[in-house]
Amino acid sequence: MVDYTDLRASLYVPANHPKLVSGMFESNGTQAPSYILCTEDSLSDSEVPLALRQVSSLLPKLAKRNGAAPVFLRPRNVDLLREFLNMDGIENITGFVIPKADVDTLPSYADLLVGRPYRIMPVLETRSIFDERGRTELREYLNRSPLGPAVLALRIGGNDLLKLLGLKRQPGISIYQTPLGTLIPQLMMCFRPHGYQLTGVVCDSLDDADLLRREAQMD
């Protein structure tokens, strides 16, 4: 059984990455503690077919990684989730990261996932998350939905939330120095007392070790 602490610092990888398959089987000590293979906003529409071919090639091989890092797929939409679920070897992944998760979008994903053995990580990255009522409605939906027990953690979509504010992360600036620095504690107070863990916002400046260190301390 995977625990949310097993995620540690998840590595987002575009599913069309040329080393998607080979990189996950390297034995030189560079493997990530967990992987999220993304087919959503890291790809353009024209890049999706290659991404699907690579995922289809990778899935059966994951059976050889017993005890290895958890692997999640981030589908672009419900149609791609359906396609993933029909692929050979899909049982070898840990679960799915659900983009743009709110009370309007989650029911369609639930229709496909309830009753299956996958863990899910909804991403909080829509306009409703800024509103207290929107956060409460999402929490109550998860509490009563059969999908709720499958939630491993809630992810905070920092870049998308900043985009909704007309902002963009700047080099050297921590997410906690942006308006999201006041939103993140509100998310914690809304969800964590009810048993829902939250992950830290992805730090996309991997070449800035000081920034990564500061964000990890705040997380």
Segments predicted by a language model, with ranges:
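Expand to "…catalyze enediolate/carbanion chemistry for C-C bond making/breaking, isomerization
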Residues: 1-219
